[in-house]
Amino acid sequence: MAEEGHRAVEAIVMVAEAPVEPGLLAQLLELPVERVEEICSELALSYEAEDRGFQLQRVAGGYRFASHPDLAAYVERFVLEGQSTRLSSAA
């Protein structure tokens, strides 16, 4: 069963528009920054071990979710087809 800190990090990062800095996560969760870093590392490793379609990445001094690189062709197809569908509907 996932610890509340793990679930909270997931929930916050999921809704964030930009990478979330560990210091902000620590403040929101009322945990030391070191513990937040551990939680993020544990989450990233568990997603990789479970061969998930997404990753928790450290970028621009913060954390964000991103699709797994080996699924780029599917994501690209979704983005391109989604764009043409939206354009066709608007016309």
Protein language model annotation of sequence segments:
Residues 1, 71-83:
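Short, Lys/Arg-enriched N-terminal segment that forms or immediately precedes the first helix
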Residues 12-13, 25:
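Hydrophobic structural patches
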Residues 22-28:
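A short acidic, leucine-rich amphipathic alpha-helix
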Residues 20, 31, 85-87:
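Alpha-helical hairpin
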Residues 15-21:
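Short capping segments at the starts of secondary-structure elements
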Residues 43-72:
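Charged low-complexity interaction tracts in eukaryotic proteins
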Residues 32-42:
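Short amphipathic alpha-helical interaction segments
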Residues 5-10, 88-91:
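Short, leucine-enriched amphipathic alpha-helices that occur as contiguous helical runs
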